[in-house]
């Protein structure tokens, strides 16, 4: 798929070129993986439509969504998003899995779930896929399910529970260098509060939905201080804007590689 680059230099690029330019694993620190979050929003700032984020994005957003999955060691997602979006195998395209292996990655990224309550939807397709590896960090005891997927549960002290603790575990115990967070809005807000987001990929869809109930991309209480963003690039396709931001003060902002 071709995209129109608006910034920094106008040009036509492909999704494959965008993916190959990311180099996310090279930006990891010894302490934790490099973390990017991918979110979608309507033009009036809503992150869900009829309770889901999936219907908001168009073809370009979905192409970039899958391209990002093809570039990372792990995908982190909240239990609510797992449940609502009915997650299955993270990389379904065989060619993408082969390309991952050529780059030194596993065929599929690890699926990482961080939960305080321990209530993980074990009935979703992800746990029925024998090719999937799921790592769960929980503040409450969880019995690993008897499922075709490989599932590892790590208990966290409730007093030390947090995204930063889970990310350190992914880096030290699983060798994860790059993490893609797919939300939802509560998870993104928690990660921003802990200052563990390095980059934000945000698609703004040409839709207006109105209302006061739908969440924004970062839900919950306001952040202690606004998180400043630095635009890395802006792409467009059929009215969809795909924006890549570096989070000010985080790793990689000065090292990001524009397409």
Residues covered by each model-derived region:
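Enzymes that bind and transform nitrogen-containing heteroaromatic metabolites
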Residues: 1-259
């Amino acid at each position: 798929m071709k995209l129109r680059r608006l910034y920094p230099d106008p040009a036509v690029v492909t999704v494959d070129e965008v993916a190959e330019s990311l180099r996310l694993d090279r930006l990891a620190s010894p302490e934790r993986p490099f973390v990017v979050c991918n979110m979608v929003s309507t033009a009036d700032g809503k992150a869900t439509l009829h309770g889901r984020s999936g219907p908001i994005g168009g073809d370009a957003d979905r192409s970039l969504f899958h391209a990002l999955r093809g570039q990372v060691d792990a995908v982190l997602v909240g239990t609510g998003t797992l449940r609502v979006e009915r997650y299955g195998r993270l990389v379904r395209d065989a060619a993408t899995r082969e390309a991952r292996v050529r780059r030194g990655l596993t065929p599929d990224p690890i699926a990482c779930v961080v939960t305080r309550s321990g209530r993980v939807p074990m009935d979703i397709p992800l746990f029925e896929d024998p090719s999937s590896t799921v790592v769960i960090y929980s503040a409450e005891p969880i019995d690993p399910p008897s499922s075709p997927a490989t599932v590892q549960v790590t208990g966290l002290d409730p007093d030390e529970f947090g995204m930063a603790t889970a990310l350190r575990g992914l880096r030290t115990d699983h060798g994860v260098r790059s993490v893609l967070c797919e939300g939802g809005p509560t998870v993104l807000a928690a990660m921003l509060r802990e200052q563990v987001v390095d980059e934000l990929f945000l698609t703004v869809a040409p839709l207006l939905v109105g209302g006061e109930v739908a969440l924004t991309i970062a839900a919950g209480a306001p952040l202690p201080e606004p998180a400043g963003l630095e635009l890395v690039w802006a792409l467009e396709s059929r009215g969809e804007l795909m924006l890549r931001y570096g989070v000010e003060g985080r790793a990689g902002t000065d090292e990001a590689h524009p397409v």
